[in-house]
Each structure stands twice: as structure tokens, then as C-alpha cells.
Amino acid sequence: KNDKYKQVEEFLRLLVPTLNAAIEAGQISKPSKDKPLSIVDLGCGHAYLTFAAHQYLRSIGMSVHVTGIDVRPASRDRNNEIAAKLGITDTITFKAEEIASTTANRSDVAIALHACDTATDDAIAWAVNGGAKLLLIAPCCHHDIQKQMEQSPEPWGAITKFGVMKERMGDLLTDALRAQILRIVGYRVEIIEFIGGEH
């Protein structure tokens, strides 16, 4: 649990200045009470990031509406119950839906913290198709490409026969392709180490 808090804290440390820069550059409208900043957290799980982003942005005076999407009805119910206890259901909502087919409205910002495997790709596709101006995505595991690398032709076999090297190669390939696709459709992309491997 402590690792998750460190990840959320680091994510917020990156979100706020990036968001402020996008607002100052006119890429995202300055949030107001009538038109709050819209954020969708894709693959939110227990919504640590969803609640933290909501509460932190509100604490610095930013009008915001946050929607959390997770496939599990139990997560939706738990998160909506917490929102009700906090009295914030007018500015935060949760839905139990697949990311690829969510009914969530378009958003200014799409975030995803460790949406597993191809759920990260679903989050990117949803954000791009919905016209999100800012995406902050911290990918998780890359199992889909790992399976496809089982029978790697030479010279790749020299790398993929070792588990840790195969995993790293899969991570690099997947994230490089994601970044290239985002660049092709018009996004400026930065790839950074989000938080050290020990977390």
C-alpha cells in the first residue's frame, strides 16, 4: 500500500505543473465553476489517484469534475460510497465499465496509473478518440507483447531467451510504439521514468 501512495504522490507531482502549463498555453481552458476541468481516470481500481487528484486540485482552487472508470462493479460501488461519505458526489463519479467501451464523457485530461497490459492501450485510444488535450499514462505490465515474443526470430532470440531481457525488450517495444502513435496523431510526447523500479 505504501508503494501505491508513493506512486500517487509522484503522479500528482507530474500532473499539476503539466496541467498548469497546458492551461497557460491555452491548450486547456482555464477551469471555472461553470466549466470545471474534466478528468477521467481510466482503470482506476480503488481510486487512490482519482480521489487524490480530485482533492488536491480542489485544494488549490481548481474547479474539477473527475470520473473513475474500472471494470469491476465492486470497485465502482466502494468508490461511490467513499465519495458519498466525503460529500463530493457532485464532482466525482465512478462507473463500472470496460475502458474501450466506457460511456464517460469526453475529458480535458485522461490519466491512467498502471492500467494492466492492453488496458493502457485502451486508455490511450479512448483519450485520443475523445479529444483529451492532456494524457498522463503510467503503463503497467506488457504481457500481450511478451506472449507474442515466445517464438522470436533471430537475432531477437538471443535477447528473448532470457526472461528479464525479454521483459525489458517487450516494455521498450510497447512503449515506443505507443509514443510513436501518439506523435502521429498530433500529441507532444515525453517518456520519463515515472518512479524507480523499487516502487
What are these regions (language model features)?
Residues 9, 13, 71-199:
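Class I S-adenosyl-L-methionine
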